[in-house]
Amino acid sequence: MNLKSKDLLGLRDISAEEIEYILNTAKTMKCIVTSNNKKTAHLQGKSIITLFYENSTRTRLSFELASKYMGASAANISASSSSVQKGETLIDTGKTIDSMGSDIIIMRHPMSGAPHLLAKNVKSSVINAGDGMNEHPTQALLDMFTILEKKGTLKGLKVAIIGDILHSRVARSNIWGLTKMGAEVNVAGPATLIPPEIEKIGVNVFSTVQEAMLDADVVMGLRIQLERQKKGLFPTIREYSRFFGVDDKRLKLAKEDAIVLHPGPVNRGVELSSSVTDGEQSFIDEQVTNGVAVRMALLYLLTRRGIVNEVTD
């Protein structure tokens, strides 16, 4: 099997079969990540560029480690220190990187659709590392991989996503991916943080966290997106925590063996209490490990796809 596109721009337009293919490949990569010898030569001779127009710690470092573990040459470009500051356009930046022989460009941008624009104008494969409020596909893939590891399947599971759904690209990618894989998705948050007509993409919307979490197999907290919000969407952080924060008492509404996830960074005492964040049902640290494995899988599959096309075309 091969990925159909040269790019990974989102989970909205990817098939369930492709998602399964990526997750199965990530299982092999997880063995490398957790071994004493993390070096392989799968991507030797390949050039991976991270192009980030927004700050990032987890995602950027995860991709850089994934590249190095696979034997690729990796370079990071920050918008603050690039020719963007001199007025260079996104397309011109992409073409410059392309001309230097890059194989994959990993891009984060504050504007929704920016990775799609880049992908149309470069020969390199483009991976969306988060675009505005649109999608964050690799985060959703690592979330699904973590669930699959702990539950053995995605089909038929009830997943409760709690928090700022409106501004969350993580929520959107998870909704697209989880529903395609047969999971039932519940969402809850302040009415001002729930997108209008979100039910049309296959989720159940609840006004209370208690309803959304009842008998859930997975509870996913979302970070309050303060940097993306206009004022007045909810009274105070304290009020948000009171009505929508997940603590030990509320977690008991979920199934006894429910797992807790969060894309990070966690605002302790807001989305999740410290006891839930550090508790036995929390697999937040495992998500970080799995992020490297999933991104290794993507780098491998996208570069492999190019090699296959060169041979067969």
From Swiss-Prot:
Keyword set, alphabetical order: Pyrimidine biosynthesis, Transferase
The protein's name in its UniProt record: Aspartate carbamoyltransferase catalytic subunit
This protein's source sits in the domain of life called Bacteria
By sequence similarity, the record places it as follows: Belongs to the aspartate/ornithine carbamoyltransferase superfamily. ATCase family.
A Gene Ontology annotation in the biological process aspect, one of them, is:
amino acid metabolic process
Annotated Gene Ontology cellular components are: cytosol
Which intervals of the chain form a coiled coil?
Answer: none
Identify the pathway: Pyrimidine metabolism; UMP biosynthesis via de novo pathway; (S)-dihydroorotate from bicarbonate: step 2/3
Q: Please explain the role this protein plays, according to its UniProt record.
A: Catalyzes the condensation of carbamoyl phosphate and aspartate to form carbamoyl aspartate and inorganic phosphate, the committed step in the de novo pyrimidine nucleotide biosynthesis pathway.
Enzyme class label: transferase
Classification via Gene3D superfamilies: Aspartate/ornithine carbamoyltransferase (3.40.50.1370)
Q: Write down a Pfam family by its short name.
A: OTCace
* Gene source species: Ruminiclostridium cellulolyticum (strain ATCC 35319 / DSM 5812 / JCM 6584 / H10)
Q: Which residues bind carbamoyl phosphate?
A: 58-59, 108, 136, 139, 264-265
Q: Which residues bind L-aspartate?
A: 86, 169, 223
Write out the catalysed reaction. carbamoyl phosphate + L-aspartate = N-carbamoyl-L-aspartate + phosphate + H(+)
Quote the EC number. Answer: 2.1.3.2
Q: Which PANTHER family match?
A: ASPARTATE CARBAMOYLTRANSFERASE, ORNITHINE CARBAMOYLTRANSFERASE, MITOCHONDRIAL
